[in-house]
């Protein structure tokens, strides 16, 4: 799920401050981790996710695309293009490919994503050996 920042409803616009609020933008429980990513064009994390259920990331993410464009493919087959300025929610069961050089910030359930990152590290070791 993605939405442009400018499309989020304004709840306050006064005294030089504008506040926007988007309710029901995913659900989370537990401690979150903050993550900052930079991808070169063409980076596809799919090979690193092979072996996880449905060969996809099993952690949900909330975030903001600072620059570039990425394509998210969900395990059901749907795809979504997310570009600079988009707020995103990616539920568990997805992969990501950078269509151009991209920078993004994500927030993820810490325990869930640590498990995925450990798996990705193991896959990277196999693929680069």
Language model features: what each stretch is:
Residues 1-46, 53-54, 128-129:
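A short, N-terminal "cap"/entry segment at the start of jelly-roll beta-barrel domains
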Residues 35-37, 63, 105:
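Conserved hydrophobic/aromatic positions in well-ordered beta-strands
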């Amino acid at each position: 799920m993605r939405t442009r920042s400018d499309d989020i409803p304004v709840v306050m616009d006064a005294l030089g401050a504008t506040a926007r609020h988007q309710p029901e933008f995913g659900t989370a429980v537990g401690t979150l981790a903050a993550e900052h990513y930079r991808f070169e064009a063409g980076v596809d994390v799919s090979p690193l996710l092979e072996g996880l259920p449905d060969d996809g990331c099993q952690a949900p993410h909330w975030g903001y695309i600072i620059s570039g464009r990425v394509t998210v493919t969900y395990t059901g087959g749907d795809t979504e293009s997310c570009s600079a300025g988009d707020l995103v929610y990616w539920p568990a069961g997805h992969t990501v490919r950078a269509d151009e050089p991209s920078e993004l910030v994500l927030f993820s359930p810490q325990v869930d994503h640590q498990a995925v990152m450990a798996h990705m590290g193991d896959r990277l070791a196999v693929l680069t050996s």
